[in-house]
């Protein structure tokens, strides 16, 4: 079945005249801010070289830390760090980047540190972070977190 397909230059010319807003301006309060990170491979061997000669020991990775509005799926802020920076170390920087009011912040157990909870309390944000496995109780000022410890 022969199908015609426009080439890149034709698509590029036509795209100039399309008036679609790519970013919707959002304002106001963020109900739930979801925070997580992922690893990115910056550079490495090509597939052929790895298959032919084997893998080298050193790899170059970076970590992308993201904060996303759960309601609109908009990326509120992002931070790129070296692979040796932990999620909890990058967390305060992500929270400080946003200047909008946040009601609650969700994150995984890796963010269950006093540094993260202190930053959320400073900005009056409710923490929705599960305690780590075999977590102990913290001082009384972390009462909300202590209620989740089983």
Model features per residue range: what roles?
Residues 57-63:
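Short, flexible loop/turn motifs enriched in small residues
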Residues 67, 78-79, 104-108, 128-131:
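Short, conserved beta-strand edge motifs with alternating hydrophobic and charged residues
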């Amino acid at each position: 079945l022969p199908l015609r397909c426009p080439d890149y230059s034709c698509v590029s010319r036509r795209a100039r005249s399309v008036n679609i807003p790519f970013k919707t301006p959002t304002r106001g309060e963020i109900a739930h801010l979801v925070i997580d990170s992922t690893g990115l491979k910056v550079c490495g061997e090509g597939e052929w070289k790895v298959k032919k000669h084997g893998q080298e020991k050193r790899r170059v990775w970076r970590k992308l830390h993201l904060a996303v509005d759960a309601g609109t799926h908009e990326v509120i802020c992002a931070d790129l760090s070296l692979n040796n920076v932990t999620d909890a170390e990058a967390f305060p920087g992500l929270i400080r980047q946003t200047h909008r009011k946040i009601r609650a912040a969700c994150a995984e157990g890796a963010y269950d540190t006093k540094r993260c909870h202190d930053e959320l309390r400073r900005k009056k944000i409710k923490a929705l972070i599960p305690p780590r496995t075999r977590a102990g109780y913290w001082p009384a000022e972390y009462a909300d977190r202590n209620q989740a410890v089983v």
